[in-house]
Amino acid sequence: PSKTLLAVRATCFGTVALAFPLSAALVFGAGVDRHRAADTLSVIYCVGLILGVFAAFLPLPSLRAWTRAQRVESVALVFLGMSYATHLSWELGWLVLRDAIASNPNAPWAYAWWAYIDGGDARYAVGDTLLVAMELLSVTNGTVGAVALVRFLRSGRTSIGARLALGATAVVHLYSASLYYASELLEGLPNVGDGFIAVYIKFGLANALWVVAPLFVFRFVYAGLEGVMRDGRKSWLV
């Protein structure tokens, strides 16, 4: 693996992870305006995740020998790992604590969710049935995917059964994200704040990865199936 690529991704994802507690500290410890802090956090979040996921396509000297298939696989696996981590942390946390989060908008511990609720999507402060159902689906998908990803890596990236399971979770990612967008857009964005950051960054770009990146996962799965058919492997579910 490319050490430079690992460093770029560690920087991107690490910055995103640190931005949440730092933003909360600035808001509740230094008196920074919560909406401005949330806007800045959303930009860091979007840039960090997108750059981290697609870093394999950067013109890094250490990646010059990489094939397009290797780059696609790298994007797919990193996206899936990041997505499962998000499902089993932020989204699972919201499902378990949603009533407490809604009741404590000024609590530092709840800021990780309110930074998105403030302008991004007020449905997370209400917890309507459709949103709860989508998040339950996401958490379930994340659990299944995490198990499949571990199995795939432990097999030396040879398990076609695990690869297919990863592809199945990408289908759910695409479906859930599309439903999330459509359910709000068709209503005229009643739960999204005004302004460029709220509409195009918090609501739009922050969720765009789950619409675009699954296409790379599908290509990664297809490449694995092509290899099986070419090699004539019989134990393809291993």
Provide a role label for each language-model segment.
Residues 66-88, 150, 157-172:
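Interfacial segments of alpha-helical transmembrane regions
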Residues 46-59, 144, 206-220:
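Hydrophobic cores of alpha-helical transmembrane segments in multi-pass inner/ER membrane proteins
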Residues 84-112:
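Transmembrane alpha-helix/helix-exit interface in multi-pass inner-membrane proteins
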Residues 195-238:
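Terminal transmembrane helical module of multi-pass membrane proteins
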Residues 1-16:
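N-terminal membrane topogenic signal
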Residues 4-8, 23-45, 61-72, 96-100, ...:
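Membrane-lumen (extracellular) interface motif
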Residues 140-158, 217-220:
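Alpha-helical transmembrane segments in multipass membrane proteins, preferentially the mid-helix core
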Residues 126-142:
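A loop-to-helix transmembrane entry motif
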